[in-house]
Amino acid sequence: MLVTSLIALLPAIAAAQVSGTVGPRTSASAKAAEKVCNVLDYGASANSTIDIGPPLKEAFQDCQTGGLVYIPEGDYLLSSWVSLVYGSGWALQLDGIIYRDKNVTDGGNMIFIEHTSDIEIFSNNSAGAIQGYGYLFHEQDEYGPRILRLNNVTDFSVHDLILVDSPAYFLNLVESYNGEVYNMVIRGASMGGLDGIDISGANYWIHDVEVTNGDECVTVKSPSANVRVENVFCNHSGGCAMGSLGTDTNISNIEFENIYTYNSTQMYMIKSNGGNGTVTNCSFKNFIGYSNAYMLDLDTYWGDESDGDGIKYENIGFENWKGTSSNGIQRSPIRILCPDANPCTNITLTAVELWTDTGDYVKQECSSAYGEGECLRQQNGTLASYSFTTTITSVPVTAYSPTTTMPGLISTSMDTTTSIPIPTIPTSFFPGASAYSTLMANM
């Protein structure tokens, strides 16, 4: 059904780290009242027989300065990738399902949006999806195109969409501003290089999303500022992260809160090696995670080394973390490994209680890290390099809790050799928390 009512209220966010409003400046209903460009009127077919690429481009050209591009319910074949560039005040309503043509092996981006503002990409039935059939690349240890990439976009939202089996990254937000992403499911194979949501830019609110993949769940990259991420369900994923970071890093005012991570690579990892620049004023609060390889991990010796003595990490807090690692003896649940030549300062750990699924003790590792909590050293005078490992044998009382489960846990890896089914979007993404926005299908 074509949108006929106000579908997106400009959010008033109380989050401290987001500066001002995010999302489109005008509603999709207002855009639709100005003009509707239905792809069926431009030669598209809803039975997956004709390439939707050219009709989608033509529809966009007619609506790019004000209007709504409409893809009704049905199945659509995408054989030629689409670039939607320039314009402002437009929306893309995807109520059908777009399928990548299995015979097309081009890289790049299936849908690329650039140099535009005041836009909304959404599904009015909360069932709009893009199926990338990435397994046809992955079974040969290869990668293909990203599903959706936004570059230099301002005042936008992406919501009520399902992205499935991407041949590479799923949703890539590059140096964009004032963006909101919510009510989404991303589901891909258990393979590296399949990032869920990648962010760089400023003033984002990412909330109420579920990600299954083999690499980052939601990750912040440089440069980034004023980003709030909350109510995220990393369901058999790589887990949330920051990085990898290198030279000229510039990240500040980042908040992650209410993050549930199950059977993933990490609960949260900040990763760099060498490099320079700063990461400052970051908060990671209310994390629950079970059966993850890494847990709380700030590792400045990760991956290939960049030029420089190390990034300066300061004013970073971790608060109210609960859960278990798959093997807390093999990989310490708490690892804060900072550059010897540039120690971390003002790092705080508060109510961080992590245990192990395997064994009867865990390790904690800190090096050149100063602040309060666990194995951190207090800042008293000279910030000398150090390395310290301690063993914990007492089980934290709140590390296990029968009330902290989520429905639909995925315990086995998504295969890289078979097609992945299209899931549905849930209404909750963190235990006890309802989504901020009602699904479009329920409005």
UniProtKB/Swiss-Prot annotation:
Biological process, per Gene Ontology: cell wall organization; polysaccharide catabolic process
Signal peptide segment: 1-16
Cysteine disulfide links: 37-63, 217-234, 338-344, 366-375
Principal localisation: secreted
EC identifiers of the protein: 3.2.1.-
Gene3D superfamilies cross-referenced by the UniProt entry: Single-stranded right-handed beta-helix, Pectin lyase-like
Pfam families: Glyco_hydro_28
GO molecular function: polygalacturonase activity; rhamnogalacturonan alpha-L-rhamnopyranosyl-(1->4)-alpha-D-galactopyranosyluronide lyase activity
Active site: 215
Glycan attachment residues as annotated in the record: 47, 103, 124, 152, 235, 250, 263, 276, 281, 346, 380
A cellular-component GO term for this protein: extracellular region
Entry keyword set: Carbohydrate metabolism, Cell wall biogenesis/degradation, Disulfide bond, Glycoprotein, Glycosidase, Hydrolase, Polysaccharide degradation, Secreted, Signal
Family membership: Belongs to the glycosyl hydrolase 28 family.
PANTHER family the record matches: PECTIN LYASE SUPERFAMILY PROTEIN-RELATED, PTHR31736
Name listed for the protein in its UniProt record: Putative rhamnogalacturonase D
Species per Swiss-Prot/TrEMBL record: Aspergillus niger (strain ATCC MYA-4892 / CBS 513.88 / FGSC A1513)
